[in-house]
From Swiss-Prot:
A Gene Ontology cellular-component term: cytoplasm
Pathway of action: Protein modification; protein lipoylation via endogenous pathway; protein N(6)-(lipoyl)lysine from octanoyl-[acyl-carrier-protein]: step 2/2
Naturally occurring in which organism (per UniProt): Shewanella sediminis (strain HAW-EB3)
Protein family: Belongs to the radical SAM superfamily. Lipoyl synthase family.
Domain of life: Bacteria
Family matches, as SUPFAM superfamilies: Radical SAM enzymes
UniProt-listed InterPro entries: Aldolase_TIM, Elp3/MiaA/NifB-like_rSAM, LIAS_N, Lipoyl_synth, rSAM
PANTHER family: LIPOYL SYNTHASE, LIPOYL SYNTHASE, MITOCHONDRIAL
Binding site for [4Fe-4S] cluster 1: C68, C73, C79, S308
Record's cofactor remark: Binds 2 [4Fe-4S] clusters per subunit. One cluster is coordinated with 3 cysteines and an exchangeable S-adenosyl-L-methionine.
Residues that bind [4Fe-4S] cluster 2: C94, C98, C101
GO molecular function, one term: 4 iron, 4 sulfur cluster binding
Protein name: Lipoyl synthase
SMART domains in alphabetical order: Elp3
Length: 321
């Protein structure tokens, strides 16, 4: 057997190339076997695309990335049209190969030291009042990228003193305590880390991740910052049952997580994990009611809900679905 080619820095691997060496092989889906999208998942495009074009131009001008584009989010048009975007720092190449995600895999470049200042200025120019910052996984960095998060938060607040900042962080595998020490110097207004799915599906959906580590990350942050809301998100449609999701919600509450997002998984390409079922809106409503009954202060549950979808409204406690 020939040895796999060494990854070249900055080269993006997608689709079949991305998932070629994960533990549970993904069999490409044939179009005729893929489930047909139900009517409740039809996305309405805005009448005008000017605002969308303006945000894309601002991102390109400042060499910034949005997870909206890199992960092919179905809500991109709606969010960009409302003047909101989720910034993705530390480049657009992830060191993981999660087969549900459309972000490219590969060997990332060195972090851009100017990114925090460029992001702060862009946010000021866009007159944003609430911003979500996320990142690719950077297992190649000693701190997993924690210092870059802290630098971004600091620079954003210097130019935008009244802004609210939510961070959606990776799992900082093997360096949770060190990462939290760094983030304690510039804590966010909301701390978010997604569990993504039930633990029995981690091997196929989140290779390289660990369910308990993710729970521990959320709990340890909350222990350090009891006044800062913690948040997590899950996808449905990967083969889990509603009872399994309910158990995850109980685990999240046992680890002091207060905010929840729950949405429908959509298959980015035939090379990604297939959608096992489309969950009806009524079932999302039932899970939202269950989440609220066990103590979540806010639960955004619906087919099109994503972690940062109307995150500003989520933080205000308003209904999002």
């Amino acid at each position: 057997m020939s040895r796999p080619e060494r990854l070249q820095p900055g080269v993006k691997l997608r689709d079949a190339d991305k998932v070629a060496r994960i533990p549970v092989k993904v069999v490409p889906s044939e179009r005729e076997t893929m489930l047909r999208k139900p009517d409740w998942l039809r996305v309405k495009l805005p009448a005008s695309s000017q605002r969308i074009d303006d945000i894309k131009k601002a991102l390109r001008k400042n060499e910034l990335h949005s997870v909206c584009e890199e992960a092919s989010c179905p809500n991109l048009a709606e969010c960009f049209n409302h003047g909101t975007a989720t910034f993705m720092i530390l480049g657009a190449i992830c060191t993981r190969r999660c087969p549900f995600c459309d972000v490219a895999h590969g060997r990332p470049l060195k972090p851009d030291a100017n990114e925090p200042k460029k992001m702060a200025q862009t946010i000021k120019d866009m007159k944003l009042k609430y911003v979500v910052i996320t990142s690719v996984d950077r297992d190649d960095l000693r701190d997993g990228g924690a210092q870059h998060f802290a630098d971004c938060i600091r620079e954003i607040r210097l130019l935008n003193p009244s802004i609210k900042i939510e961070i959606l962080v990776p799992d900082f595998r093997g360096r949770i305590d060190a990462a939290l020490d760094i983030l304690a110097t510039e804590p966010p207004d909301v701390f978010n880390h997604n569990l993504e799915t039930a633990p029995m599906h981690y091997r196929k959906a989140r290779p390289g991740a660990n369910y308990q580590w993710s729970l521990d990350l959320l709990k340890k942050f909350k222990e350090r910052h009891p006044d800062i809301p913690t948040k997590s998100g899950l996808m449905m449609g990967l083969g889990e049952t509603n009872d399994q999701i309910a158990e995850v919600l109980k685990d999240l509450r046992a680890h002091n997580v207060e905010m929840l997002t729950l949405g429908q998984y959509l298959q980015p390409s035939k090379f990604h994990l297939r959608v096992e079922r489309y969950v009806p809106p009524a079932e999302f409503d039932e899970l939202r009611e269950f989440a609220e009954s066990i103590g979540f202060t806010h639960a955004a549950c619906g087919p099109m809900v994503r972690s940062s979808y109307h995150a500003d409204l989520q933080a205000q406690g308003k209904e999002v679905k």
